[in-house]
Swiss-Prot record:
Residues 20-55 are annotated as: Disordered. GO terms for cellular component: Golgi membrane. It is found in: Membrane. Signal peptide: none annotated. The keyword Membrane applies. One of its GO terms (biological process) is vesicle-mediated transport. InterPro entries: TVP23-like. The chain crosses the membrane at residues 113-133, 183-200, 204-226. Residues 20-34 have a biased composition (Polar residues). It comes from Dictyostelium discoideum. This is Uncharacterized Golgi apparatus membrane protein-like protein 2.
Length: 261
């Protein structure tokens, strides 16, 4: 026997609720009124058009939107980005060396740009930037240049007359260079000094003569590597990838950089 509870719903055994509602989102072809019924905490296997219960897994979608969309587009995008990054790293012969080659340069530039956001003053920013620039200079000169493009340079002071001699090494003729790693190496090598030239000009325009010390040191270290590897690539004419990257990309970037001076 049915009875009416305090909330105005008709119920027969205390756990089944019948709700009759009319809404344009639930209209059918035969009637403007549609019945949705369900048993709380149970599975409803009736033949009604729309039936389900809270906790039964059917009829009412409480995790997604009202129209039944799953909303998994964001996870798919992140998964695609992650898989693309992994595939790109697998295509590199020396992924760690390529990452280090970019990491120190990018870290020094970002630290110089956003030092005010981290509450660091000039002294702390100066020390951290010099450390990052020194790590970058050493790693490029001795590690990443040898691994990514098969080139290495160094200079030595002659103890007899005090003259400074430069030495340029290239890999043997059978050494093959990964073209992606070669582009990463040369573009970052020639592109980084352009940012420091812009920072140098900004300090002059804004009369920040204390902060100008960081771009000067950065340019000195970066241009030493640019000169050394440029001479190495010219002496290794058999390496087509290094010759193209250093001659074409390097000269165009150096010409643009010299136009600012």
């Amino acid at each position: 026997m049915s009875k009416v509870n305090d909330f105005g719903f008709s119920e027969s055994n205390g756990d089944e609720v019948g709700i009759t509602m009319s809404t344009p989102f639930l209209e059918s072809d035969n009637s403007n009124t549609q019945s949705i019924s369900g048993r709380i905490g149970s599975n409803n296997n009736s033949n009604s058009k729309n039936s389900g219960g809270i906790g039964s897994g059917g009829g009412i979608n409480i995790n997604g939107d009202p129209y039944g969309n799953s909303g998994g587009g964001g996870s798919k995008t992140s998964n695609n980005f992650g898989s693309g990054t992994i595939a790109f790293m697998k295509g590199l012969t020396h992924p760690v060396a390529a990452s280090v080659h970019v990491l120190f340069k990018l870290s020094a530039i970002l630290l110089y740009l956003f030092s005010g956001l981290f509450g660091g003053g000039f002294i702390l920013t100066f020390i951290l930037c010099i450390l990052l620039l020194s790590f970058d200079f050493y790693s490029v000169k001795n590690i990443t240049g040898r691994l990514l493009v098969g080139l290495r340079w160094w200079n030595q002071v002659d103890p007899k007359d005090g003259s400074n001699k430069w030495y340029f090494e290239t890999a043997p003729e059978g050494h093959r260079v990964n073209q992606i790693e070669s582009l990463i190496f040369w573009i970052t090598l020639y592109g980084t000094p352009i940012f420091w030239i812009l920072f140098f000009l900004k300090c002059i325009i804004s009369l920040q003569f204390a902060w100008i010390l960081i771009p000067i040191i950065a340019l000195s270290l970066n241009m030493a590597n640019v000169y050394g590897f440029y001479k190495c690539s010219n002496s290794n004419v058999s390496n087509a990838a290094a010759t193209f990257a250093s001659n074409y990309i390097g000269r165009s970037l150096l010409q643009r950089a010299s136009s600012f001076m």
